[in-house]
Amino acid sequence: MPSQGNNKNSENITQNPIEGELGSVIVEHLTKRIRNFTKKKQKILKLEEIAASDSNSLNDDQRKALQGKDAVLTTLNELKELLSQIDATRIRDEKHKRQFEATENAKRKEEIEAQYREGYDTAQKQVSSLVRFLRFASHNCVHPSDDAPFNSAVEKLLVIVYEGTEKSEKAVADLNDSSTDVVPESEVSFQTISSRVDNFFAAPLPSEQAEELIEDDYAEQPEQAVGQPIEQQSISDDEARQTNRPLNRGIQFLNESEIEGQHVEEPALPSETSVPANSTLQVPTENVEVDVLGKDGTNIYPTQNQVVEQKQMQQKLDSMSPEWYQAADPSNGVVDGTPKLNSNTRGSSKRPSVNRSQGSGQRGRGGRGFYRGGRGRGGFFNRSKRGQYSNSNNSTSQPSPNAELSNFNPVA
């Protein structure tokens, strides 16, 4: 019982702020009284020192003050003791107050958590009911039942849910609570729809029964003839069953090697071959370009068209010979396969022996650019000396071994 009394006192102190203010006033008054009596005590101690040295020097008031020493000390001690008790009581009350606040906070926290769990569970149930109803409504739209009023009620409830208003929230709450109220503009109650939704999700096919149905479906498929494409077996809406296994609808991607039966071989293109991988492939010679040098130093091109094109290209290159290339001197021959050069030829050893492709727009004097010649002096083309080099099948115009190139006299 004393503990209950202490709890009541702590609750009273906590709930009544006036007592806290009154306690502060009392403590302030006691502190002031203790300070005054402490001064009186110090004054009496000084008078005692004076009386000990010279007792005749004290007057009547001082002697009366010395006579009231005991009363002053007694009152001072009582005030100090009272103040200490008040301080202890205040400390105890503050401790009880903190404990009481902690207890109240814990209770309040538990209540809030309980309310949160309750609200969360309620909201989760409503969301679950809504999702399950949407799944059932989609299935019922594709595979309607034989009950026309029920189908109409499901569609109307679905329209109400899609509105997203307070009416929709109330409809979802009634569906979650399995209310006996009727769906607006229908004769079916929320309880009936909720029970049908529960039955829709409460009866999945067992695994053994599902395997038997799969085996039956494969057994009922007709045999396909050899070479005929595989046809997908369609299932009507009346034969659709609620199952988690995939239906025999969709696209099957098969490699050609995975399809059984005979296959008609496509004719090979001219540049292709249909020889098996384990045999030797014989490539026709007319489809291959042979890059082999012949005895005369020219490349061999099997096809006639390529030879004609090469000759035309060589003629175009020879027609663009620059001015500083001069004809060979017939008097000088070839020594050991190397043409002899005239000693008077200036810079002939530095001249390239291969014609450079120059365009008709690069005419003029020196340098590069529009209407300018190639490297060296003078870019004017000498078109009258087209027979300077022999035409060969080689793509690079090399001088003929029989040509006499001794007189390469550059034009000043």
UniProtKB/Swiss-Prot annotation:
Residues 1-20, 223-243, 310-412 are annotated as: Disordered. Residues 390-402 have a biased composition (Low complexity). One of its GO terms (cellular component) is cytosol. Residues 1-17, 340-355, 403-412 have a biased composition (Polar residues). Residues 361-379 have a biased composition (Gly residues). This is Uncharacterized protein C12G12.07c. It comes from Schizosaccharomyces pombe (strain 972 / ATCC 24843).
